[in-house]
Design a protein with these regions (language model features):
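Bacterial N-terminal signal peptides that target proteins for export
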Residues: 2-12
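Bacterial N-terminal signal peptides
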Residues: 11-21
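Boundary at the C-terminal end of the N-terminal hydrophobic targeting segment
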Residues: 24-26
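Conserved, structured core segments of small domains
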Residues: 30-168
Length: 168
């Protein structure tokens, strides 16, 4: 009897898990379709170091967060940058990728609600308006289509990402 109950509950658990997983994959397959790119804001020195060493880049909060944060909506980039990274000094880049270029490099992109970056909560205006691409691994240099420069003000505020929009 105990063996029969175990088999029943195991099957029930697997059925629920597979169903939930299918729903997540289905939701994620359409989530980023409105925007063709996945962007990642990165300290220039860290990216330059990864490129020079021909290594995959992992952000400083990767171990804590479990993924690399991204943004699909270009209109959200400066808001995200100013919320999470304004206090971090130095030059920054914005990496332009696609889910396909990331997948070709061996990582999956999952569109989910916002999540903390390290210990910084995602409580910026509009944080709950859309799903954000979470890159389930590091970023290889081959996954990046373009490296955009970021302009910052004297107080560290992020002002502009050069070349973000066509015709700039």
């Amino acid at each position: 009897m105990l063996k029969t109950n175990f088999k029943f509950w195991r099957r029930a658990f697997l059925a629920v898990a597979i169903s939930a997983q299918s729903q997540v994959f289905a939701a994620n397959s359409d989530s980023g379709s409105e925007y063709p790119f996945v962007f990642h804001l990165i300290q220039a020195a860290l990216w330059d170091e990864a490129v020079a060493a021909d290594k995959t880049y992992f952000p400083p909060t990767y171990r804590q967060d479990g993924f690399t944060h991204g943004t699909a909506n270009p209109d959200k980039l400066l808001t995200v940058a100013n919320h999470f990274y304004q206090q971090t000094e130095g030059d920054w880049y914005c990496l332009r990728m696609t889910t396909e270029s990331l997948r070709a490099s061996g990582v999956t992109v999952v569109f989910e609600s916002t999540a903390p970056v390290g210990d910084q909560p995602p409580d910026f205006e509009g944080s709950e308006d859309e799903l954000y691409p979470h890159i389930m691994g590091g970023i290889s240099t081959g996954a990046v289509l373009e490296v955009l420069t970021v302009e910052r003000g004297e107080a560290g505020e992020f002002l502009r990402i050069h070349g973000l929009y066509p015709g700039e």
